[in-house]
């Protein structure tokens, strides 16, 4: 065993201060003296390869690894797949209970064992042993319908696999679902999966291209957190639709520029949203003011987010909102207290309009990689008194154009307590100039502190 591995499983100390003083060298292995059940509990936190290493510590440790109800293996730790398969077979036969089944397999497996048969057999055996957590990464392997019916399963994580057609889905205990680059049988199969998880609380979906689902319906009465990601592959179809109906949802993350439509039915409990989408306005596609169905979809999307308290928006999303705002007024966000936004080009023009919709905004974070060189845009827009704003953090290089934004915030925020400027290396060289200009800017708030980092 390597030194680091031994340090994790063995702790020694002197029997007593007297023996230490006498230099007797007598030591006690305190971990080995623990009850076997407690040792097994400790070993549950280690990968299986490290658990097996403990068998060389002493006679007592020789077979303890066999009673650890957790399998966590990576095929890279085996010279060939046949050896991996043989080990898993022995492990599953010797354990009546398996709490967690975690397996990482590459796509270049050598051996005579049939992969599909192995995946079916091992998952079936884990289910029979009342498994609570399944975590499988196995490019291209087919996961058979047994996975859809497991009363004990609490969390399910599948990566790069293909799900077969379900006849029936019943996952009454499943609370966490993570699907990463998974291919579904069809849309109806995905709908069945969602409807068969009555207590699901967290769902993360990282979509692959051509996953056989055009309209993705995430409908759940129990869901608290939903994270949605998509690939930027050119093979992605351009008519993808996401329908979200989750009245208990509190946290939402959307990140995929190529999904054309997001339809929000009910997000009445939403607290936090992180939005990085542009409704497929990319690869040459532009916002069309005359496309009334698209405008209605965007309007309903923004209204669906209107109860949120904390929101982060990417530059591409702000671009769409800016184009939309020139056609229709933005909805109100009466609960929004924290707003973080990344923007570029001239899209900071939207800020005064957006501020009008946020009557209770208290904290604002602004990030940008690019600003227009001209001192324009915001000064010509209608002035909006930021009556609730207390904290502002600006994270980008400062120049004359960006100082106009700082001026706008200082002059229109009557209860602002702190404005923090986080400068990059180039801006720090001009810090004296920046500080002199800051001093000359009138402040609407008499108690505002300006901090330059």
Swiss-Prot record:
LRR repeats: 155-179, 210-235, 246-269, 305-329, 358-381
Keyword set, alphabetical order: Leucine-rich repeat, Repeat
Entry keyword annotation includes Repeat: yes
Keyword Cell cycle carried by entry: no
InterPro entries per UniProt: F-box-like_dom_sf (IPR036047), F-box_AtFBL13-like (IPR053781), F-box_dom (IPR001810), FBD (IPR006566), FBL13/AtMIF1-like (IPR050232), LRR_dom_sf (IPR032675), LRR_FXL15/At3g58940/PEG3-like (IPR055411)
Region Disordered, annotated ranges: 1-28
Pfam families found in the cross-reference section: F-box, FBD, LRR_At5g56370
Limits of the FBD domain: 373-423
Residue ranges, compositional bias (Polar residues): 14-23
Start and end residues of each F-box domain: 28-81
Identification of the protein by name: Putative F-box/FBD/LRR-repeat protein At1g66290
């Amino acid at each position: 065993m390597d030194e680091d591995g031994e340090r994790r499983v063995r702790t020694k100390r002197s029997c007593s201060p007297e023996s230490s003083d006498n230099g007797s060298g007598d030591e006690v292995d305190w971990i080995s003296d623990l009850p076997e059940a407690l040792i097994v509990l400790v070993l549950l936190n280690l990968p299986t390869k490290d658990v097996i290493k403990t068998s060389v510590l002493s006679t007592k440790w020789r077979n303890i690894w066999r009673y650890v109800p957790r399998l966590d293996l990576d095929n890279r730790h085996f010279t060939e797949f046949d050896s991996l398969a043989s080990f898993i077979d022995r492990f599953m036969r010797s354990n009546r209970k398996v709490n967690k089944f975690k397996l990482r397999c590459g796509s270049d497996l050598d051996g005579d064992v049939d992969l599909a048969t192995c995946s079916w057999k091992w998952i079936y055996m884990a289910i029979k042993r009342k498994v609570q957590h399944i975590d499988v990464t196995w490019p291209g392997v087919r996961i058979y319908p047994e996975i859809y019916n497991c009363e004990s399963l609490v969390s399910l994580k599948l990566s790069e696999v293909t799900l077969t057609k379900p006849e029936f889905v019943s996952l009454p205990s499943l609370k966490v679902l993570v699907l990463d680059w998974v291919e579904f049988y069809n849309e109806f199969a995905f709908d069945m999966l969602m409807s068969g998880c009555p207590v699901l609380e967290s769902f993360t979906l990282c979509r692959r291209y051509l996953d056989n689902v055009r309209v993705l319906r995430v409908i759940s009465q129990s869901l608290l957190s939903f994270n949605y990601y998509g690939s930027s592959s050119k093979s992605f179809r351009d008519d993808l639709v996401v329908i979200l109906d989750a009245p208990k949802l509190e946290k939402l993350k959307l990140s995929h520029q190529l999904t054309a439509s997001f339809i929000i039915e009910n997000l009445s409990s939403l607290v936090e949203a992180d939005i990085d989408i542009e409704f497929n306005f990319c690869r040459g596609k532009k916002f069309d003011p005359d496309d009334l169905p698209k405008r209605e979809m965007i309007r309903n999307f923004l209204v669906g987010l209107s109860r949120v308290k904390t929101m982060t928006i990417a530059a591409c999303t702000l671009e769409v909102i800016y184009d939309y705002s020139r056609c229709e007024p933005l909805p109100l966000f009466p609960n929004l207290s924290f707003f973080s936004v990344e923007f570029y080009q001239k899209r900071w023009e939207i800020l005064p309009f957006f501020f009008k919709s946020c009557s209770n905004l208290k904290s604002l974070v602004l990030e940008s990689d690019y600003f227009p060189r001209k001192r324009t845009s915001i000064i010509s827009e209608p002035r909006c008194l930021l009556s609730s704003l207390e904290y502002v953090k600006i994270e980008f290089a400062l120049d004359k154009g960006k100082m106009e934004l700082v001026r706008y915030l200082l002059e229109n925020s009557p209860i602002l307590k702190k404005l923090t400027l986080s400068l990059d290396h180039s801006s720090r060289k001009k810090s004296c100039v920046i500080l002199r200009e800051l001093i000359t800017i009138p402040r609407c708030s008499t108690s505002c502190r300006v901090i330059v980092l």
